[in-house]
């Protein structure tokens, strides 16, 4: 009886350990996934826009591609408006995934708004705007930087046009905000990057020879994919092994002489990053009222002038008849 109890206790203890380990693995995995999104820049840079005006996403996405932003010319205080970011690309293109296979391109964007502008709260967004937004999830670049918004990566087939719901500030409640013209900056990428934040290459870029010499051996890795290329220096017999991950296509063959930094592979990258800017005016309602009053007074003055002219013409005509 005692033996059965001990066995039961041992089984219970092992099951508890297994459940605990499984939960830890799940938590760690989920954390790593969430930390990888939406963009690596959040982990490495306090501000996504450098003093030179360059957005840091260009450090990893080396190819230059277009991006477009559309915002209203002017907005009133405490108003929700749309900032539309367009990331165009050929929808037929396929990119190299991390496992070396081909797949659709993803897109992502960072929107740098003026201080005081921020993501509109859900209860202020109209149903029409929510429909345009789709199922996108926006977040602040930092908890203390609500004016910088990021989104992605998301499927490019569905979200090559991204609608940001923005709430304009009210200078009456935010004294640091004024009725002025402000710049808005945007960066948008399509496809994976070529360099990781730690400086290492992804498999979505070209690989060059790290030494000059004869390609003495090419070994194809069967399990993970990719190649091991052995380069032999005929002058001293030194051998250099370059590792090529799965994805890029090999351009060299055994027995071929290659130079230092000569491309060993094709460049599989079909995506790229672009940045742009726009301007928006935070308009004072009193100015609009003043402008309307001025226009109304001008119209009334014109009407009075016309009436006065007609009256004068009638007087002249009466004098001539007399």
Curated annotation (Swiss-Prot):
Claim: Metal-binding is one of the keywords in the record:
yes
What are the GO MF terms of this UniProt record?
Answer: electron transfer activity; heme binding; iron ion binding
Q: Which Gene3D superfamilies match?
A: 2.40.50.100, Cytochrome f large domain (2.60.40.830), Single helix bin (1.20.5.700)
Q: Which terms does the UniProt entry file under GO BP?
A: photosynthesis
Q: How is the cofactor bound?
A: Binds 1 heme group covalently.
- Its primary localisation, in coarse terms, equals plastid
Where in the cell is the protein located? Plastid, Chloroplast thylakoid membrane
Q: Which UniProt keywords apply?
A: Chloroplast, Electron transport, Heme, Iron, Membrane, Metal-binding, Photosynthesis, Plastid, Signal, Thylakoid, Transmembrane, Transmembrane helix, Transport
Q: How does it sit in the membrane?
A: Single-pass membrane protein
- Name the coenzymes or cofactors required: heme
Family named by the database record: Belongs to the cytochrome f family.
* Function per UniProt: Component of the cytochrome b6-f complex, which mediates electron transfer between photosystem II (PSII) and photosystem I (PSI), cyclic electron flow around PSI, and state transitions.
Tell me how this protein assembles. The 4 large subunits of the cytochrome b6-f complex are cytochrome b6, subunit IV (17 kDa polypeptide, petD), cytochrome f and the Rieske protein, while the 4 small subunits are PetG, PetL, PetM and PetN. The complex functions as a dimer.
Indicate what this protein is called per its UniProt record: Cytochrome f
Organism listed in the record: Nymphaea alba (White water-lily)
The primary gene name is petA
């Amino acid at each position: 009886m005692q033996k059965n109890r001990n066995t039961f206790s041992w089984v219970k203890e092992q099951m508890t350990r297994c459940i605990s380990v499984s939960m830890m693995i799940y938590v760690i995995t989920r954390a790593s996934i969430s930390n990888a999104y939406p963009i690596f820049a959040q982990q490495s840079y306090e501000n996504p826009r450098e003093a030179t005006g360059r957005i840091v996403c260009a450090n990893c996405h080396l190819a230059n591609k277009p991006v477009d932003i559309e915002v209203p010319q002017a907005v009133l205080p405490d108003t929700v408006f749309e900032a539309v970011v367009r990331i165009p690309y050929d929808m037929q293109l396929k990119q190299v995934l991390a496992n070396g296979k081909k797949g659709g391109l993803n897109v992502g964007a960072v929107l740098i708004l003026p201080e005081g502008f921020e993501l509109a709260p859900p209860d202020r967004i109209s149903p029409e705007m929510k429909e345009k937004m789709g199922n996108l999830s926006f977040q602040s670049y930092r908890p203390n930087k609500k004016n910088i918004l990021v989104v992605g990566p998301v499927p490019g087939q569905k979200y090559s046009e991204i609608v940001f719901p923005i709430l304009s500030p009210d200078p009456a409640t935010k004294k640091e905000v004024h009725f002025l013209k402000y710049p808005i900056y945007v960066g948008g990428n399509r496809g994976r990057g070529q360099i990781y934040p730690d400086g290492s290459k992804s498999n979505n870029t070209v690989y060059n020879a790290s030494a000059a010499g004869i390609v003495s051996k090419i070994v194809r890795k069967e399990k993970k994919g990719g190649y091991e290329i052995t380069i032999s220096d005929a002058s001293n017999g030194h051998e250099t092994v370059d590792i090529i991950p799965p994805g890029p296509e090999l351009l060299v063959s055994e027995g071929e002489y290659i130079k230092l930094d000569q491309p060993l592979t094709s460049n599989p990258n079909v995506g790229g990053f672009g940045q742009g800017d726009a301007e928006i005016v935070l308009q004072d309602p009193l100015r609009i009222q003043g402008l309307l009053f001025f226009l109304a007074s001008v119209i009334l003055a014109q009407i009075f002038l016309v009436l006065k002219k007609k009256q004068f013409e009638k007087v002249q005509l009466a004098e001539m008849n007399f």
